[in-house]
Amino acid sequence: MALLSLRNVTRRFGGVVALDGVSFDVVEGQIAGLIGPNGAGKTTAFNVITRLYTPDSGDVVFRGESLLRSPVHGIVRRGIARTFQNVELFRTMTVLDNVLVGAHTRGRDATGQALEAIDYVGLRQIAERPVAGLPYGTLKRVELARALVAGPKLLLLDEPAGGLNHEEVEELGRFIQQIRDDYELTVLLVEHHMNLVMGISDHVHVLNFGRMIAQGTPAEVRANPDVIEAYLGTDDGTGRDA
């Protein structure tokens, strides 16, 4: 059953068509990958899903209801949380206070939930430290804890492996699968690291110049000639041209 559906979504920026009639489903309980070259429209799709952008046409349906009637601040309460390509945190606030921003409730219950999420991502020992000066990989875990404390049904991860080395990327893949299982949620993943996407995704969607050019299992996508030409021609594990 589809938890999320984009239905013929188009989004323009002046004369540039960032998304051109894009349609795809994300099945509940799965990890789905959304891939494509730089500028393909992946982050724009995330921004449409989370209502930061309104599509020029088409619809976004979540749990059977259109999201286009929801305000931006209502998306988290609908059950969608996300991380960003560039980490978005309050640098003068502590790890705990940053995670509390994502909590639905306030007071003692919220603090307990936030500490539980912080502990889950392995940062309990620095919960009271300001995030300024923390390593980039740690900041990404803080952002992930903030997303998890909201109790989402759908978790959007925008390039979570950015800045990580090979061993850290492998660990991240296992962690994303663990999150899916432990929190019983669905994951939509935008990522340039092909080994990560193909290794953990149940289904992969491929964008190129704002159009959906392929969808299927990792094996099907890897074998698709259009994908090979557009994106997977390199074999360095990153999907980037040398």
Tell what function each PLM region has.
Residues 1-242:
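Glycine-rich phosphate-binding loops of nucleotide-dependent enzymes
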